[in-house]
A protein has these predicted regions:
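Bimodal "functional hotspot" detector
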Residues: 1-215
């Protein structure tokens, strides 16, 4: 049973009724044309329309995507990963997401640099490499915020360990755990990945390669 979702007071979110259907495990990145909506609890109080950076997939590797959102709260930015359909332009870029289409972001909680991300049970429908990609998308997006250093995950309020490329399963992860999943800035497959995106990707890659200590 999911714990009660705390609704962000900064903007209204329409609840979309979905038709019940059989659920199968998701092992491939999905295209961005989805209709799921989500409500989340804000982790930071910054409000006002702004541009945020989400991390999506280009041929299975992580690339940044600038997205205009109503505010720059952590819950809003991560919520867009679970419901990217609000930005129709990104659907034409050929980018994908491994975050399962039917999963919901229940809430987020920031405590001393560690963000706890609570997701609905549908997140468990993604398995294998796609699950690791989905976790990496969330971690890279969350750690765009300077006050977030680490991420923990919960499913229906229960702590879960998540896979990393180098450390195996871990209860707390950082962006350093997913450096190997970043796209090569000089070899992105989508022709519409513009120079600004490549520059942002190169900067984040250089920062992580400098600051991350091999384990």
């Amino acid at each position: 049973m999911s714990r009660t979702v705390r609704i962000a007071a900064t903007f209204a979110c329409a609840l979309v009724a979905t038709t019940s259907c059989a659920i199968t495990a998701d092992d491939e990145p999905r295209a961005l044309a989805v209709t799921t909506t989500t409500t989340t609890e804000p982790a930071t109080p910054t409000v006002g329309g702004s541009t945020a950076v989400l991390w999506m997939l280009d041929d299975g590797q992580l690339v940044p995507l600038s997205l205009s959102l109503p505010d720059h709260m952590v819950s809003t930015v991560l919520g867009a990963l679970f419901d990217p359909s609000s930005d129709t332009d990104e659907q034409h870029r050929g980018l994908t997401s491994s975050v399962p289409v039917d999963a919901r972001l229940e809430d987020v909680e920031l405590n001393g640099g560690t963000l706890t991300v609570n997701m609905s049970e549908e997140f468990d429908n993604v398995v294998g490499p796609s699950r690791q990609q989905a976790i990496a998308q969330i971690v890279l997006t969350a750690t765009e915020f300077p006050n977030i250093e680490r991420v923990r995950f919960e499913v229906d309020g229960e702590p879960v360990q998540v896979a990393t490329p180098t450390r195996g399963d871990a209860g707390t992860v950082t962006a350093c755990d997913y450096v190997s999943l970043l796209a090569d800035p000089t070899n992105t497959t989508q022709s519409t990945v513009d120079d600004d995106t490549r520059e942002r990707l190169a900067e984040r890659t250089a920062t992580l390669e400098t600051t991350c200590v091999p384990t």
